[in-house]
């Protein structure tokens, strides 16, 4: 697991805001920067892990930002593979990056109430690898539902494709999204490839991050 210093965390935050500024513009960018400001969700953004257990992916302080940046990079690479294969891409780069950057936004929780809090039980840390636990102070929500709720709270609009990309990033790992991927009627199939690319990029990123953890173990 990575052990970031305060300086490292600040650099990661600055890189993320810089990435937003390269992709988005106008009112949308300003609202995103406000949502991620220190007065709003900035603290949660910087400190959040990407998961709660060390054998999942990026379960350390700052892991969330590492993960979403990995997903964004892998999603863009996956899009290029699509194009090289002669498949027509039916979404914009902005839609791709918006969905990638925000597919796990719900893991930030709400302002002042993070989604993950440190696990205090040494037994759970030792025997289950549980470094963080879900914060019971927040209303229970699916991570993607909270992501969309947060975007709505800050007045950040999104396209239908961006919404579907965020909703379906977990692919078949989420029982609630299976009907979107498994359809026996042509007219009910997904009408954009964005969710496929987002899911593959998310899955790849999780595996890469998990492999880094496996390789870092002393035995």
List each language-model region with its residue ranges.
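Non-catalytic interface/linker regions that flank or bridge core catalytic/transmembrane domains
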Residues: 1-49
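Divalent metal-dependent catalytic cores for phosphoryl transfer on phosphate-bearing substrates
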Residues: 52-61, 66, 78, 89-213
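Conserved hydrophobic/aromatic pocket- or pore-lining residues that grip, position, or stack substrates
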Residues: 71
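Structural motif corresponding to the C-terminal cap of alpha-helices
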Residues: 75-83
